Amino acid sequence: MKTGNLFNTVALVGRSNTPGIAEPLATLAACIAKRGFEVVFEGDTAREIGISGYPALTPAEIGARADVAVVLGGDGTMLGIGRQLAPYRTPLIGINHGRLGFITDIAAADMQALVPVMLSGKFEREERSLLEARIVRDGEPIYHALAFNDVVVNRSGFSGMVELRASVDGRYMYNQRSDGLIVATPTGSTAYALSSAGPILHPQLQGIVLVPIAPHALSNRPIVLPDDSKIAIQIVGGRDVNVNFDMQSFTALELNDTIEVRRSKHTVPFLHPIGYSYYATLRKKLHWNEHASNEDDKAS
């Protein structure tokens, strides 16, 4: 059905294995459908909550058919569907039904008021970058993955430090003994990288940050690189080393394996309500400015 709006078909994606998510998803679907939009569900979401009356699609089918995806869940849900829809440039709207909610910025209590307004074309749009990584073993690529937040090379919980050789654009950077190394996007700079004393990168900054995890030498500090950098991390020493992609998929590594990381050609459009402020998100999520303030988020 044509609505005369920027969007016609809206996909709904929900957080897996979450008690109480069926009712808000059904409510949101009805709220959107009665305004003339076609509503489809991500297949696993539809099966899990037992909803009928709407098409149930794979992520690839959503990418080909939907104009926008509304995600109800936590940051992990947003990361997972974002990676799958990245090749299709499907815009995402995030509704927080998790704990932290750095990138799912709409409160569930506000979704019926805000989402229809956004679907009518009133929103703020930004592009979020991704990383692509491949593992090379004996000169041959053996694994490839996208990451929205970060690519993390780290040891298992029962092994000692690992030694990693890092180079950038073919130039040697250092050998580092540590618990691992994080390669993060600006979006991922407020995830694992932040807990390892990495800097916060504004999402619109074109950069990639390398953050050591518990390095043996305190002089091994985080460094922000240009986002067109090509990063190579070789496993020089250690055992039980893994590489994780957004902490949602991983593979075991062997000595002399190399992880090659670069910015992906794909970006994911995030849609926010009018008046969205990244700094307000930081204040709320990181508990900045705990004392009352008369300041607001209006541009001066």
From Swiss-Prot:
Enzyme Commission (EC) number: 2.7.1.23
Cofactor(s) essential for the protein: a divalent metal cation
GO CC annotation terms, alphabetical: cytoplasm
Gene3D superfamilies: Probable inorganic polyphosphate/atp-NAD kinase, domain 1, Probable inorganic polyphosphate/atp-NAD kinase, domain 2
NCBIfam families noted in UniProt: PRK02155.1
TM segment ranges: none
Catalytic site positions: 75 (proton acceptor)
Molecular function via GO: ATP binding; metal ion binding; NAD binding; NAD+ kinase activity
BP GO annotations: NAD metabolic process; NADP biosynthetic process
Family: Belongs to the NAD kinase family.
Organism: Burkholderia multivorans (strain ATCC 17616 / 249)
Pfam families in alphabetical order: NAD_kinase, NAD_kinase_C
SUPFAM superfamilies: NAD kinase/diacylglycerol kinase-like
Principal localisation: cytoplasm
Catalyzed chemical reaction(s): NAD(+) + ATP = ADP + NADP(+) + H(+)
InterPro entries per the UniProt record, alphabetical: ATP-NAD_kinase_N (IPR017438), ATP-NAD_kinase_PpnK-typ_C (IPR017437), NAD/diacylglycerol_kinase_sf (IPR016064), NADK (IPR002504)
Name this protein carries in UniProt: NAD kinase
Residues at which NAD(+) binds: 75-76, 149-150, 177, 179, 190-195, 214, 248
Top EC class of this enzyme: transferase
Function: Involved in the regulation of the intracellular balance of NAD and NADP, and is a key enzyme in the biosynthesis of NADP. Catalyzes specifically the phosphorylation on 2'-hydroxyl of the adenosine moiety of NAD to yield NADP.
Cellular localization per UniProt: Cytoplasm
Keywords: ATP-binding, Cytoplasm, Kinase, NAD, NADP, Nucleotide-binding, Transferase
